[in-house]
Amino acid sequence: MNIDFESRNITRRSFLKGAGVVGAAGLLSACGGSKSNNSGSTAASGAQAPNSTGATPLKEYISWESANREIESWNLLYSQTLSDANVVTNLWDGLMSFDCYGKLVPAIATSWEANEDSTVWTFHLRDDVDWVDCNGEVKEHITATDFLVGLEWVLNASKNEANNTSMPTLYIVGAEEYYEKTKDMGAAAADLRYQDMLDAGVGIEAPDDYTLVFTCKHSCPYFDTVVSYTSFYPASQALIDELGIETFRGCDNTNMWYCGPYIVEEYIQGNTKSYIPNPHYYNAANVSRFERLTVTMISDQAIAFQLYQNRELDEMDLNESTITTITSDPNNEYNSQLCEKRARPTAYAMHFNYQKNNADGTPDVNWNKAIANTAFRQCFYRGLNLKAWFSRYNKINPLKCENDYYTMKGLCYNTQGAEYTTLVAKEMGFDAEKYDGETMIRLRANGGDISALKKQAMEELSAIGVTFPVKATYFIIASSTSALDNATILKQCFTDSFGDDFIKLDVQTYVSSLTQEVRTPQLQSFVINGWSADFGDPVNFLGQETLHDDNAFYSHYYSNIARVAEAPADYQKDLMDAFEQYTDLVNTANAIVNDTDARYEAFAKAEAYLLENVLVSPTYYDIAWSLTHANEYSKINAMYGGCNYKAVNWETSEEAYTTVQYEQFAKAFDAAIQG
């Protein structure tokens, strides 16, 4: 179907419906009929949207999603993908939500507290929350029982098919045993109800209709962040009984029940989703919502740019070529409207392999000896200038991508409001350093001069038989020209920073699976990988690098330090001592369960030790540029959970935001999170 991007004789919404912007009309699923015409400002009435610029806010908003990220499951209890959660977060609320700084705020829970050792958590619920159907008609009142039903569904292997069990089985008393029981029962487990779960000793109870109590296996001072995960969302037994287990598991927008800020007005698979306000939303008086929110599936950014220019999109992310098109023309109207977004909630780092093999399966002793040396590793953190490489991710402000920490910024705050990584910066001695657009923060102390460290490393390593240059093997997928371009620039960064007489990047390729072709046979010198949090505590990051823990992901699957620990070579003694000391620091911090500030201070010391010894070397944040009519800094910005696409309290403007305005938003945001 042809798309006439010049037409102005149709509405924005009718254009999107008729255009089929991803090339196929898809399957139409609608609910509510003409009733949507009555939603308007009445259903959306409540708190005024934030307005820091005096602009005229938008009543309707058109956002976008990549065509390869279409929703697959509308059931949050069953789904395990963010692409699903990004949709359903607007339709289905849980105990907790987040604000624009990523801090926990009440949702269905109004308040919560823990006992002294943080093993028992009590949540007090609102008494005014209803389930509604796709027409916005009230079906049932939500009580604490709905959360019992939801957890039983998740833990019942016959019902939820083992999805989303990891969080409750890891933390809740009896949850793992109940899951195993249902797995052993097979199909018969489908007949179990929440009372069977309680009788089996699972650590959840509802002493009254609006109180929910969880009992944890061990002290868990961050459990309020754990229950933000979708495993702990409510479900209605009445709806499950009405639909049956199979249909409830595979429910869609037409037969599910809603308790979130919106209901689905219309869904055209592969094309658009439109939401209108839930007329019985419990928090309507306290949050602003759009009269209509439309999400358009986009298969090509060139199409997205045309749609944005024609005001058929209100926001879009920009790739490098589009930015180049705009910035290469000084008269381009969008030059003043380029808006830099906040970092995506993932911290990327260079994960060294301490037990590397050659292609024939024999140990790569040269690399293994080199990477076990502290001075050698410190050259990466203190001397590798990645500014040119960052430009691949942020063409305009490459150093905004600099990541100096292992834990993602914004993960958690102490009781004084200070963001956790500011505590790490203080431990590292660069808390007074600020972004200047010129020099990486961690290179400023010595100007990136690692000549003394390099000399020390080469002398110490030559004495144990290491030959130079040390080859650092880095794998990229063979089919990606972009990955090759990135790797070529990274290789030049190695040359410029280390000198080819010291460390030389060797770029290799894999066909399809990094895990099977590279990580499992242990062929890499390092992998650059990102970690996104599961919950809001530093141990979720720092615990991935410890020894003596089967759940330490990177220790087992990337660095292989857990394998080294089984039989370390003589040259790995100092390395193992460093990991043991780091592990002790993490465990000491994790044992502090009744003093949040002391806990975070202790974790900051552990993280600083990790960084000073460069057991892993942080690399970058992913920061995109956009054209937009929404203030990104007004949106939910959680580092964990699935709430970031919840469209409440967005500040918007009829006029596109400018670069200057976004710089002001960023400055205010940074000041706020630094306490």
Where are these regions (language model features)?
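Gly/Pro-rich hinge or "lid" segments in bacterial periplasmic/extracellular proteins
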Residues: 186-201, 207-210, 215-294, 302, ...
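Aromatic- and charge-enriched surface segment that lines or borders ligand/interaction sites
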Residues: 110-175, 213, 304-307, 366-372, ...
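Alpha-helical secondary-structure segments
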Residues: 139, 143-149, 209-215, 261, ...
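Detector for C-terminal structural segments
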Residues: 379-426, 478, 482-492, 518-675
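Extracellular/periplasmic solute-recognition and catalytic clefts
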Residues: 67, 265-279, 294-361, 387, ...
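N-terminal lobe/hinge region of extracytoplasmic solute-binding protein
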Residues: 63-117, 257
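N-terminal secretory signal peptides
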Residues: 1-10, 14, 18-28
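Ligand/substrate-recognition segments at binding pockets and active sites
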Residues: 269, 307, 397-398, 434-533, ...
